[in-house]
UniProtKB/Swiss-Prot annotation:
GO terms for cellular component: mitochondrion. Its cofactor is Mg(2+). It comes from the Eukaryota. Residues 1-48 form a transit peptide. GO terms for molecular function: ATP binding; ATP hydrolysis activity. It catalyses: ATP + H2O = ADP + phosphate + H(+). This is AAA-ATPase At3g28570, mitochondrial. It is found in: Mitochondrion. Transmembrane segments: none annotated. Keywords: ATP-binding, Hydrolase, Magnesium, Mitochondrion, Nucleotide-binding, Transit peptide. GO terms for biological process: response to stress.
Amino acid sequence: MFAENLTRIGSNVAGLFFVWSTLKRYFPRQIQQLLFNAIQRIPIFKRLSDKILEFFSPYAYIRFREIEGYRYNYAFAAVKTYLGAKVNSEVKNLKGNQVKENMSLDLKRDDVKIEEEYEGVKMWWEIFRCVKGKKICRLTFHRSNWDVVTGSYLRYVVEEGKSIKARKKKVMVLMNNPSLNWKTSMKGLWTCTEFEHPATFDTLAMDIDKKDEIFRDLVAFRDGKEYYDRIGKAWKRGYLLYGPPGTGKSTMIAAMANLMKYNIYDLELTSIGNNWELKKLLIATTNKSIIVIEDIDCSLDLTGEREVKDLKGDKEGKKSNAVTLSGLLNFIDGIWSACGQERILVFTTNHVGKLDQALIRRGRMDMHIELSYCTFGAFKILAKNYLNIDSHHLFGEIESLLKETKITPADVAEHMMAKEVDGSLKGLIRALERIKWSQNVKVEEQLQQGD
């Protein structure tokens, strides 16, 4: 095999030398240079030259791609973090980042090429982008150091990178790019930014017992790897958040992410072309993540039809290529849903009755959480958050009115934006009295219509 490869390379090299000598004999120097540059751009000659250099080179190369087969490469992230953290007085190229005004400046290496030495072995890292825009870290080292590099060195780099990343862990929120742009855009499947929502379980305005139940369930899931391995079930969990607008569904998701330190993947189903693209997005999510589909009853027609009927007309024809209910069900708990670990899936809806029961049954959505109108317990949390008070002589009147009215926590919070305590509480009482009067009028009108 070696002899055959050597013979083939020798034959190709001889052919190149013949072409080159012919060019030098019959063409002027400028034409020679133009032709030589043109030949270099021809893919077959470029591949040939790369193979020749690789064959005779004493160096070996290891590439770490950001995406491998549509899946995120965790080794790439660890290597990139490790290289970026190697900051000292000898480094000439740095980049500074300050994501918040009151945070300290974060310095990272911004070198395209980085020289590294480990146990007396020299090697070189390069960071560059491939044709599709994804980054690649390439390690170059002498072949004689193969055992050291592929053994202890790479283990050290990956573990150190993971350790640095854990110490500087930041929650990110990602949204899926429209599938029509996947081939032309350099952004890939997901676009991300840092998540800065301050919500915590302490500040959530909801029933304390229900909040504690959700908190304990999340912690048990986070610490449940051995449990899920023992029962032979994929390490994932589903939560259905339902209730009127303004009851804190999005805030609950933010509190979940801040508690778990998981990234949020905000999945917009209407920008996905078909079920295959939905699977592709799932594969591209990372472990320790929360996949969110907000207002799922508005995203697609998921009210009971498992298949989209093939009706006439362009409008109906387009539907056949869209995400179907069966595709979404496979996304939740099909074979492909087990391609990662430690994932949480969250659906939100204002109208739970509109959803197909197959979508929200136990096992898919393990916990159904109703976020309803403001209770007195939720009000007390809001009063502590906004006004920094635990009690007040107007609390009794407010408690009585809350039992007789329907008002969301968001509306209650709006009346507490003023820092003056008495004025805020009195304004809330007036609002509750107006709501109570309006509700009574509606009841009387309904009774009159019934008569």
